[in-house]
Amino acid sequence: MAAITASMVAELRAKTDAPMMECKKALTEADGDLAKAEELLRVKLGNKASKAASRVTAEGVVASFVGGNAGSLVELNCETDFVAKNDDFLAFSKTVAELVATQNPADVAALSALPLEGSTVDAVRLALVGKIGENVSIRRFVRFETANKIATYLHGARIGVIVEYTGAEEQVGKDVAMHIAAMKPVALSSADVPAELIDTERRVAEQKAAESGKPAEIVAKMVDGSVQKYLKEVSLLNQTFVKNDKQTIEQMLKAANAAVQKFALFVVGEGIEKRQDDFAAEVAAQVAAAKQQ
């Protein structure tokens, strides 16, 4: 059997970006044949990627990009917060955000088919899955293209905001974006709050008010009051500005001669059910798998 040297392992790693131990195993299996080892690794990484594809991705990052008259916000998911801090994962996230802004894909499928690094976005994603050993997915994105101004704000890479606004001061856009990240409004104004959210809030208010035992006309006023309070709490323009509790966002914008046209807010993993594993069962499964190898 041919001797496997450190330089051979390093060369294979440089070609495939695979972990060192995987490179050494492939070279051993290929009896030192670099080309064969590279082929074996690509097969292994492909299998690794396909196995990982079925796993839940509830961690991840939000990335943003603004260039020219377009801006984007994207959410990419992985399985653990450890990988969410991985340099390769973060670099891929930033690249995807830039592609969304500059190429204007219609949806995630179109984005995945865009050319990247001599291949496609999806091929690069799969290579990343093989390299880090976790499923990676592009969950969603939003793109703003406008003659107005665009501001973005990222809070710890887990919360991202993009805002389209008008006004002379860039600080206004930054302040609004930061406020949205902190207060998480669901709509720009009360009139924009989705009907299903209002209906849910009304049902809850009706149940609470009915328990008071007060006359029907009083109950009706209590319900209306609760709904109006809710609308103010979840609509951006009616919220109290986080940097000045004497102003609403609407008042702050008016004083700055500015206006917000629209915004988007992404929170990593929002709406994704995380897998809750039984630790003992997971260890037992790993032991059983090891015995079969």
Swiss-Prot record:
GO terms for cellular component: cytoplasm. Residues 80-83 are annotated as: Involved in Mg(2+) ion dislocation from EF-Tu. The keyword Ion transport does not apply. The keyword Cytoplasm applies. It is found in: Cytoplasm. One of its GO terms (molecular function) is translation elongation factor activity. InterPro entries: EF-Ts_dimer_sf, Transl_elong_EFTs/EF1B, Transl_elong_EFTs/EF1B_dimer, Transl_elong_Ts_CS, UBA-like_sf. Keywords: Cytoplasm, Elongation factor, Protein biosynthesis. Its main location: cytoplasm. Pfam families: EF_TS. Associates with the EF-Tu.GDP complex and induces the exchange of GDP to GTP. It remains bound to the aminoacyl-tRNA.EF-Tu.GTP complex up to the GTP hydrolysis stage on the ribosome. Belongs to the EF-Ts family. This is Elongation factor Ts. It comes from Burkholderia lata (strain ATCC 17760 / DSM 23089 / LMG 22485 / NCIMB 9086 / R18194 / 383).
